[in-house]
Swiss-Prot record:
The keyword Metal-binding does not apply. Forms a conjugate with ATG12. Part of the minor complex composed of 4 sets of ATG12-ATG5 and ATG16L1 (400 kDa); this complex interacts with ATG3 leading to disruption of ATG7 interaction and promotion of ATG8-like proteins lipidation. Forms an 800-kDa complex composed of ATG12-ATG5 and ATG16L2. The ATG12-ATG5 conjugate interacts with RAB33A; this interaction is bridged by ATG16L1 and promotes ATG12-ATG5-ATG16L1 complex recruitment to phagophores. Interacts with TECPR1; the interaction is direct and does not take place when ATG16L1 is associated with the ATG5-ATG12 conjugate. It comes from Sus scrofa (Pig). GO terms for biological process: aggrephagy; apoptotic process; autophagosome assembly; autophagy; cellular response to nitrogen starvation; immune system process; mitophagy; piecemeal microautophagy of the nucleus. Its main location: cytoplasm. This is Autophagy protein 5.
Amino acid sequence: MTDDKDVLRDVWFGRIPTCFTLYQDEITEREAEPYYLLLPRVSYLTLVTDKVKKHFQKVMRQEDISEIWFEYEGTPLKWHYPIGLLFDLLASISALPWNITVHFKSFPEKDLLHCPSKDVIEAHFMSCVKEADALKHKSRVISDMQRKDHKQLWMGLQNDRFDQFWTINRKLIEYPPEENGFRYIPFRIYQTTTERPFIQKLFRPVAADGQLHTLGDLLREVCPSAVAPEDGEKKSQVMIHGIEPLLETPLQWLSEHLSYPDNFLHISIVPQPTD
């Protein structure tokens, strides 16, 4: 991996100013004030909203409280998607703060997974990390790690500790110099215009002739509608961590520097905003 810690830090410490408001039909004993929070892009909603939950529960009766869930403009927010991905996919062109509605009843069973504890988040996160390593290294790296290393990865994310996390995670983004990159790039492409949750296929970072594949190469192969023809109008934005990388950027570099802590590149394809 190229030593570019500033990029890694910028990604890790990315924040989204957010205003949480209790749904108007929730029964409260007194008015519920909105709650403001800077959400870490790399984390998960159910991991960083304990204060939000406590804030609104203070004005509610115990019998009116069941599992908390969140929505944005009518769309339930999937807790197992990283926060930055949710924002890029659903709210990237909206004004800040991001306005999220909080619910304590009518859980949308068809749209969301239940999240009864942080153990469920940890299990999901580690499952993604293991899947990513299977793609990158045939699971060699994660299998060679000890249980305490897996725990350190998780605790680094949970406690927002950059160095604690990256001490272990750097091993997951190394590769033999003679290979020029990972075996396959762990990526998922999300679109608001389709019912399909995401696109995920096997894609190598290096072509047969030794040339590095780019973000544009990936999109042209697996999601060609996201790439404007040379003489055509640009209809889509390709977002990773709130930025629009150049299509000429090598995929290997993106995977090393702009992957989320679960080691996947989460790529959002959203309609090009109109002025």
